[in-house]
Regions:
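Thiol-/selenol-based redox modules, centered on thioredoxin-like
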Residues: 167-212
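Short active-site neighborhood of thiol/selenol oxidoreductases, capturing the structured segment around
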Residues: 67-91, 95
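Conserved helix-turn-beta segment immediately C-terminal to the redox Cys motif
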Residues: 73-74, 91-117
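Short loop/turn microsegments at loop-to-beta-strand junctions
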Residues: 52-53, 75, 178-180
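N-terminal targeting signals for export/organelle localization
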Residues: 1-54, 58, 212
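Thiol-based oxidoreductase modules, predominantly thioredoxin-like and allied folds used
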Residues: 109-124, 140-149
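Short, acidic, Ser/Thr-enriched surface-loop or helix-capping motifs
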Residues: 59-60, 185
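Short, internal strand/loop/helix patches
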Residues: 131-178
Length: 212
């Protein structure tokens, strides 16, 4: 091999190596982005697409709602009930705290977070009750309800569990239910499922990634 051929081959090898390195770097970057979430990544899931798929959902102000209403915001949706003693208030309080963390770190980010609460106890959770309940956490959070028969279909679509636990009287019952939240990106696509007890800091970190 003469000197010229050697140099040409060396240049080609260097170019190929550079391309391989670049592709590897891009792949690594994509992989890191995919595993950056602390919550469970359910991007592309064929469920939990919209809570109106099985019927009308009305917020505590009496307005019909869908995920599309909150385009441009990251939506965090939780299923619960107002007489829940621990899981529900803790989850909503953590979301409110996560929103404050985002706002503190970058002014305006807090306004891009929308908290939603769907009651699994429409018999007792009237619109006035739901509105008062949301006032305990954040004035922008919205609670929603639908008819009991429609709720069954909504829960099925979200793969969410709930069950009435009888009490001593007809009205003293409790509710057993899944403990976690669904998170949608600014385009209304479901992206994450956050487990109960993850904490405000972890939630804020995930929400920040979806705001980018």
């Amino acid at each position: 091999m003469n000197k010229r051929s050697f140099l040409q081959n060396a240049i080609k090898s260097t170019a190929i190596l550079a391309v391989i390195t670049l592709v590897a770097a891009l792949f690594a970057a994509c992989t890191e982005q995919k595993i950056a979430f602390i919550s469970v990544d359910i991007t592309g899931a064929d469920y939990a697409k919209d809570f109106t798929a099985s019927g009308t959902m009305v917020d505590h102000n009496g307005q019909a709602r869908s995920v599309k209403d909150f385009a441009g915001k990251v939506v965090v949706l939780f299923f619960g009930f107002t007489q829940c003693p621990d899981v529900c208030p803790t989850s909503m309080a953590e979301l409110a705290e996560a929103k404050k963390i985002l706002e503190k770190n970058n002014k305006g980010d807090g306004d891009k977070i929308q908290g939603l609460f769907i009651t699994i106890d429409p018999e007792r959770d009237t619109l006035p009750v739901l509105k008062a309940y949301m006032g305990n956490f954040d004035p922008t959070f919205l609670a929603m309800r639908t008819a009991p028969d429609k709720l069954v279909a909504v829960a099925k679509d979200f793969k969410t569990y709930y069950k009435k636990i009888p009490g001593k009287t007809d009205t003293s019952y409790s509710m057993d239910h899944s403990a976690g939240s669904f998170v949608y990106d600014t385009k209304g696509n479901v992206r994450l499922y956050t487990r109960y007890g993850s904490g405000a800091d972890a939630l804020a970190s995930d929400l920040k990634l979806l705001l980018k």
